[in-house]
Amino acid sequence: MNDWHEFNAAIKSIYCNAEGDSSSIINRLVGLAMKSEDSTFIEAVLVLKENVSKVDKQLRFLWLTSTINSRFYPPIPISEASPVSWNKTEYCAPGTEELQRRYPGRAKLQNEEDYSGGIEQCRDVPDCSLVASLINLRSKNLNLPLIKQISSTKYHVNLSFNGSNKRLVTVDISQIPTSVDGKQLSLKSNDISDKIGELALLLVSKGTYSTDGSNISIDTYRLSGFLPEITQVNSYPFEKLWKFHKSNLCLMGAGTGNRSNDMIKPLVENHDYSIIDITYDSRLVKLRDPRNSALNVEISYEQYLKNFKQLYLNWNQEKLFKRSQVLHFRYDTSRYNKFSIVADKPLFHLVNNSKVTETVWLLLESHLQDEGSQENRSVSFLNEAPECIICPIEPPVECGGNHIGLQLVKLRLDAETERLLYCYSTTNNNFSIHSFSVVKEICFQRLKDTKSLFAKVLFSFPYEIEGKASFDTCNFFQNPTFELEVHSEQDYQVLMDAACISTSSHDLINIQVYYFNDYELIKPIMFDNHYQPGQGLKQDVPILTNVKYMIVCSTYGPPASTEFELLASIRLSSSWRLISGITLRSVNLIYGTYPYHCRNRFHWKETSDKLKIQMTLPTKKYSTNKLFIRVVPVESSARLRMRCNIFEPESALCVYECQEYRTCPSGGIVIPDLEVSRTNIVVLMIERSVPISSCLPTEGQLDELELFVGSSQKIRIEKYSDDVIPK
């Protein structure tokens, strides 16, 4: 068997290592095969040599997620598995001191060929759902799970978990806890394969006989791969249930849950039962209690509705569908759960390319993790993305599997339509999504290229802003500002959504959208004066592709968080496939787009309504300098009105003229892209329309303003005459 042990080590190394040349490993196995007289070993080496070049990321992912509680369960069909074990221990421990005391011995699993009853649960093993699952499988003459004996005491079993229906589990039947009178911790059955199936699933689930319990849908899926559906007992009318049962397309069970004491006898609470028959004329549901093979309970459909909480269905996907595929991925909460919105989650694209409506089923499977992990406390689900994908996530209305790690989603897609779906989990875990369809025209894939759907940027608020910077203040223009442009080959009008999100719900957030050249922030598109806790959301904003826009994010008070995210997305109904990309980037437009910046504060004299500021330009002859000038009062006031003019002091020639007084907008008064040439000094004259003495007491000091100048070349701001007192 040494050759087989080396074969196992080699195949694990090849499939689990992304890098490295495997040729030396293969050559060594080929050398062993040439010396071997075991035809099975020789064939296994040849198959491995042929398939080693076909190893892709998805298959490697399956191998890398094979370890649970220090045991390795590779994705290998039993027909291709080596006849040796992958793990040192392959039997279950009792689990509790009480079970250890009552079952002190260890003996080989008893083969009860003379037992005449049906499959029956051992009262000391709380696995009624597992036994009920085996009862259902045998009632339909299904020899599942697949089992192969490899020695006198060891068996290979293929179970369905962690993304594969061919997980190889080896069980050792020589170490079964046994009482002094010969009773064993094992179900009763005249077929030892039922006992082996139970042992294999107990080994994988917890490794002991002291289980936490499960349900029929989960255990039937693990044993057979049949698709689990968990729903309320009243989800389907009686006629539907009868059709399901007669179709032989599914296995059925029901759970009482934590019911009240008025439950009819002999039903008990927190117990699963197999549904073994449904009579149409009498509307009777026949149940089998896994604890007693002689006890079949017949109840009316009305009693079924009253006494049971959940209906369990497991669908035979091989009878329902012709095509299937599976995607595997890792969910990292530090990456996907920082902000609770759809766009930040793993996205999946489902397309029906056929000419008719098609049915597609998706199964979201959470991978089993080590004992003590957060798996049992996890919530995970797959859901259709809303039109606005930057909205907060919402669990599906009907999601029976979001707490148990197996969620079945049934969809009907119209001809030549598509759906966008997202996955959410409260904990770190590996996931697999299985898709099933009848026709090959169904395409399901991970949406990794999201540039035509949304763009996002992380940012923090600058600390240099003094005081409030909400849109009703003169500091509003200093908030984080972003350039947005949606690109397409042709020009379209599309609906855009934008969201600014904080990691703190204490932040009150607002976002405004402007045309990019609206430096004074005069005309917001669809102005919204609300500040929302934790997330500012702006929806259905009509914009044109290939046109630049500006987004300004603000908080009502000092930000509580240092981490914010801005997202802009196109509505799914806005032909987002015609979009070639979305650009969203941080920009500083306080000084326009120029590289040189000057900033200073100035006071008006109490006796004057004019303020003159001298700007000294480079003395280089014939040079042209471009200026971006922003004039902002330090205190906001609706009563303060100003006008700005620029002239050459020597010639008194007006370089920029404004005759009307204006109320100062949110972005201040801006003179953009002013070209100055053939002179090295210009004077900015700022005039106000009311004297300071007439301001209201609540308005504070209106005698101070701030000047921001961007320029293509260096300039210097200094006082002109005696009107200016730099501060």
UniProtKB/Swiss-Prot annotation:
EC number: 3.4.22.-
Coiled-coil residue spans: none
Keywords linked to the UniProt accession: Hydrolase, Protease, Thiol protease
SUPFAM superfamilies, sorted: Cysteine proteinases
GO BP term, example: protein processing
UniProt-reported outcome of changing C128S: Loss of function
Gene Ontology MF term list: calcium-dependent cysteine-type endopeptidase activity; cysteine-type endopeptidase activity
Domain Calpain catalytic as annotated: residue spans: 70-317
Superkingdom field: Eukaryota
Catalytic center residues: C128, H271, N296
Purpose of the protein: Required for the proteolytic cleavage of the transcriptional repressor RIM101 in response to alkaline ambient pH, which is necessary for sporulation and invasive growth. Probably the protease that cleaves RIM101.
Subunit note: Interacts with SNF7, which may act together with RIM20 as a scaffold to recruit RIM13 to its substrate RIM101.
Remarks, miscellaneous: Present with 432 molecules/cell in log phase SD medium.
Family indicated by similarity: Belongs to the peptidase C2 family. PalB/RIM13 subfamily.
Protein name: Calpain-like protease 1
Source organism: Saccharomyces cerevisiae (strain ATCC 204508 / S288c)
